[in-house]
Amino acid sequence: MKVLVTGGAGFIGSNFIRYLLQARGDVEVVNFDKLTYAANPESLADISANPRYSFVQGDIADPSAVSQVFQSELDAVINFAAETHVDRSIEDPSPFLRTNILGTHCLLDAAKKTRLPRFLHISTDEVYGSAPAGRSFTEEAHLDPRSPYAASKAAADHLVSAYANTYGVSAVILRCTNNYGPYQFPEKLIPLMIANAREDKSLPIYGDGLQERDWLFVEDYCFAIALALEHAKPGAIYNVSAGAP
């Protein structure tokens, strides 16, 4: 089984590549990553010599680069590649629109042309907006993104569903809550809080500080992604969480 992982040098992508190579001895992984500010190639240093792992530097929003990497016979694509930092999306939405929407479109177009057997799109629960206190979202909930980042991911989700319905692309969408774990980008909340606390710096408070979030350990999410890779229903959307804010 040959799997293309986009954004595999990022936090969740790198953890998933390591998980998949360890869990499945019959899987070959191609890591396709632009290596932006959030990438951490060192997170994959321990598997770089694995004969079942290869790396290709490229941009998912570049049609020619995507077309080239799709020339090998792929069994699945898992799209982790994304601009994900909410504050950065507020400062400048343009990179988020390019990568998260146009990049996803390039991948879907290639999947359509090559009749890819499986396309997993890694989305986020932020496409739903803010839930009322004590309530959670189902997969049928209305999308109500509240930031340029969330809006770009919601648009990408709609594209994935449209390609599944219109062209028969065997696509699945996973919407996960916040992850934490090894190799997480230091600007993210938990690493930032820990670093600031260790250095006796102030801890950032967002809004009134009373928000509740569901946090999921990244290796548990990797297990869920691997499960979806094997068993998810084409065209389906799955929420993934720990279920414990």
Residue ranges and their predicted role:
Residues 1-179:
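N-terminal Rossmann-like NAD(P)+-binding domain of SDR-like oxidoreductases, especially those catalyzing
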Residues 47, 135, 186-194:
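A glycine/serine/threonine-rich, flexible loop-to-helix segment
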Residues 49, 167-170, 194-205:
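A short C-terminal helix-loop "cap" of Rossmann-like NAD(P)-dependent dehydrogenase/epimerase domains
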Residues 65, 106-109, 215, 220-223, ...:
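Conserved mid-core alpha-helix of short-chain dehydrogenase/reductase
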Residues 111, 164, 197, 228-229:
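Hydrophobic pocket-lining residues that define ligand/cofactor binding sites across diverse proteins
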Residues 154, 179-192, 199-201, 205-206, ...:
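Glycine/proline-rich active-site loop of Rossmann-fold NAD(P)-dependent oxidoreductases
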Residues 173, 215, 245:
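Short aromatic/basic micro-patch
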